[in-house]
Every structure is written in structure tokens, then in C-alpha cells.
């Protein structure tokens, strides 16, 4: 149940009845201060200006046409023409009870779409590093959220499984006569890659064989395809281990690597040339885009085929967009990659649209993100300046969480302690990233992310277990609790009830904008509001049984909302800490 959306629709209709045009926007916002209501309509003044009317007079006309008596107990015109909306406590109690009895906390699927989410996308024959973390966990949180909202989500792990380097790798695999390639650890494969590159650079006979294998691989040679498949399988098995540790929902079935689009590339380039979009320049095929200018102010050229006949990432991304619309029948395609890819993606998609491969109704969205930085403000590296392997980062998270939990609590069984350590350690790394606006860079700081204070995973996980402990102290029957009447009299009860009913607003924003930090901020605010409620409104020691049950209902919905919200983020909860 999205209060903001309901109010927006109703007030927009009243604005239209009062004379505004169909494109008007009520601009409903949550109010920052209780004296200004629970919500404000901020679009009255802009609409009044278009009509040449006094904003306060137009606001009164809107109120005269507004039917909100069931939702709002009071409406008032404030300042130059704002409308302050005070929600009706009776309506709040009805909606809270409905959310408690609904499997998705009152959130119902609307406008179901098929959405492709392209995320993670590591390279074959290389181990995942910290540079893959953001795409993997942000994309996964958005995928989980869109599924929760009722959409059909297709995960696309666009792995780098094609290119000239595979000739070199196949040649070296053959040279080593390694018949047990599928058993190789990826750490060995990293060294294997370096050795293959060294041979390629230093041994011309080897390099010639490697180049020959590239041609054979691209032409479908069975031997080369088998060797290539081994390299892909080794890599994906190791990546799957990282995904499991990160509690990420990607599976091997979600792999849609660059090689998937290879059969499409020649015909796409031929068609671009036929349409006059691609022209020859020094043997290469280039698309010139007026929408992008080079440093001389001329239309920027985007190469779609090199003069040696090879294709580029742009060509593959055009094919991917076409495939996702035509074959996967998607309504939206979201790509999670870093900001440095923004121009590349916009150019590929502009060519896709110019060629008529997808209609305007098909939404192509680059959900770009900033970099993970060290405390020195530079890209996050090892002490020696090397790339940090993702597995090593997760190992350190577990080590630090082990120290932290051992200091905090010795009243847990070994199994309980192990579960808490994993949830806190991995959760801390994920939440520290997800809680930041994805478009900005952020500083990776172990001390901050493992703190039990502030907007962190440990704080959120503890907030959840704290509420669980309330229910562990009572033997109340869940059926009886759901049937008990809910009353909202205290201001703290009211504030908590409203925040609980704003869950869908946060979730819908994540689904629309691809911004998990909005959900993190919501959950942090909810935990803080519950803490204040808990301090001021006795629950188990309430003055009478009816108030106790009513407050337990608010506590139960808070518990469910925190758990559901953290689940959407891919953060595990525990029953005891």
C-alpha cells in the first residue's frame, strides 16, 4: 500500500476538477515536521501559476473537490499554497492490520513487467575482485526487490567469455597437457593466465598457434570449443562459490555471456551498413553520432567492426539490447556497471534505437555506480598496491566479525555464533555499500561498517533480534494477536504506524530507480522510530492487556518489515546476537 501514490492520484484528480490540465502533478512528499502534517502536496503553486490564479485560492478549490475523508482526519492550506495532510488514526489501524495479515506486508503486484537485470559480469579465466562487488550486490538487491513487487525478473550475468585471449589460453592448456582442467583452482588459473601471456609475448611459435586457435574457436572448431568450455566452467564454479558466500541469487543458469550474441553480430553490422548508419573508414565500419561530439566538435565515430573483421563491445551491447527485447520479450533492461561505462552504453543504445531494433517503449537503463575507495581516497587496493580479490575481502570480513562477536557475547552456542559471525561479517560489507547512493564513490572503512551504532548491518541486525526477544518473553498466540484490536493513541504509536505504512514507497523507489540506499535509509529510520516507541510505550508491562496486544501488533509488523527489507537487500538476520 503506497500512501504517497494514493494521495497523489486523489489530489491530482481534484486539481483537474479545479481546472488544472491532465499533466499536473500534486508533488506529494512526506512531511519533515509533525506540525505540517504527515504529507504535503507541493504541486499546487505551479498549477495555479499556469492558470493565472492565486495559489491559496486554487488550493481551496482543490480541497472543495477532494474526497479524502477516509484517509485524512485534517487538511489545511499552509504558506503560499501548500496542502498539509494529517492521516486518520482509524484508517492507519485498518491498514496496519491488513499489512500484518498479508504475505507481502500489504504490497500487491501492479503493472507486472518482464525486466532483464544485467549485473556482476566477471571475466572468464580471472578471479573475481572487489571491482565486481558493487555490480553484484546492487544488481541483486534490485532483482530481489522487483521480484517482490511481482515482476518477472530475468537475471543476466554478462560474463566476459569471448575474445582473442582465449586462443592464448587454449594453446597454453594444450602445452601443459592438462587433462584435469576442470579440477583446477582459480588461483592456479590466475597464474595460468600470467604464464600463458608470458609465452604469448616471448614465444613467436606459441603466439602463432594462439592466433590460429582464435580463428578456429570463432569458426566453431570442436576441439577449441571444448577447451574453451572447460575454462568457462572452471571460472563459473569458483564465481558461484563467491555468490553463495555473498548470499547473491545468481546461478549458473543466469549466465548470458558475450559469446551468446556472437551469431547475431555479422548480420547486425551488415544491416547497419545497409541502413546507411555504418560507413567505412580506413577499413573499419563506423557509426557517426550527431548526439556525441569529439574534441573538434564533429560527430563522434563509434566503431562497430574493426578493419580485421573483429567486433567490439559496442556491437555486442547492441546485440544484447536487441536480444533482450526480441527474444526475452522484456519491457525493461537494467545494466549495472560503473560510471566510466556510461558514454559507451548510451552510444550503443542510441545506435540500437536508430537502427529500429527496439521501440521507444522498451526502457534501456544504465544504473551506473561510483568507485570503492580506500581511506586515502584512492581506488581500494592491497597494502602492496595490488587488486584485492573478492574472496580475500570476504575472508577478512569473517575474521573481523569473529573478533567482534567474541568480544560482545559468549552466551551463544558454537552453531549460533558461527551463524552470527557470517551474517554480521558478510552483511557488514554488503550493507556498507548498499547504504550509499550508488552514483557516488565511497570510502571502504572496516571500523565503520562493523559498528553497532549508526546505519550499519550490525545495528540493523541487532534491532531485529531485539524485537524478536520481546516475543520470546511472551507466550501470546499469533492467531489471537492478529485478531486483537489495534488502537493508536500515543504520538509514538502514530509515528511508528505511519513509518511502517511507508515501506512500499521505499521499495517502489528501489524498483524504479535502482537505488537500494533508499531502502537502507528507510529501515534505519524505522529502527530508530521503533527504539523511541519502545522506550516511551511499555509493551509487555503495558497498563492493560488490550494496549499490550495493540503494541505487540506494531512490534510484530516492525519485525516483519525489518526482516523483509533486509532480505530484499540480501542481508541475513539471526534470532539471537
Curated annotation (Swiss-Prot):
The keyword Nucleus does not apply. Its EC number is 6.1.1.19. Pfam families: Arg_tRNA_synt_N, DALR_1, tRNA-synt_1d. Monomer. One of its GO terms (cellular component) is cytoplasm. This is Arginine--tRNA ligase. It is an enzyme of class 6 (ligase). The keyword GTP-binding does not apply. InterPro entries: aa-tRNA-synth_I_CS (IPR001412), Arg-tRNA-ligase (IPR001278), Arg-tRNA-synth_N (IPR005148), Arg-tRNA-synth_N_sf (IPR036695), ArgRS_core (IPR035684), DALR_anticod-bd (IPR008909), Rossmann-like_a/b/a_fold (IPR014729), tRNAsynth_Ia_anticodon-bd (IPR009080). It comes from the Bacteria. GO terms for molecular function: arginine-tRNA ligase activity; ATP binding. Belongs to the class-I aminoacyl-tRNA synthetase family. SUPFAM superfamilies: Anticodon-binding domain of a subclass of class I aminoacyl-tRNA synthetases (SSF47323), Arginyl-tRNA synthetase (ArgRS), N-terminal 'additional' domain (SSF55190), Nucleotidylyl transferase (SSF52374). It is found in: Cytoplasm. GO terms for biological process: arginyl-tRNA aminoacylation. Its main location: cytoplasm. A motif ('HIGH' region) lies at residues 122-132. Keywords: Aminoacyl-tRNA synthetase, ATP-binding, Cytoplasm, Ligase, Nucleotide-binding, Protein biosynthesis. It comes from Haemophilus influenzae (strain ATCC 51907 / DSM 11121 / KW20 / Rd). It catalyses: tRNA(Arg) + L-arginine + ATP = L-arginyl-tRNA(Arg) + AMP + diphosphate.
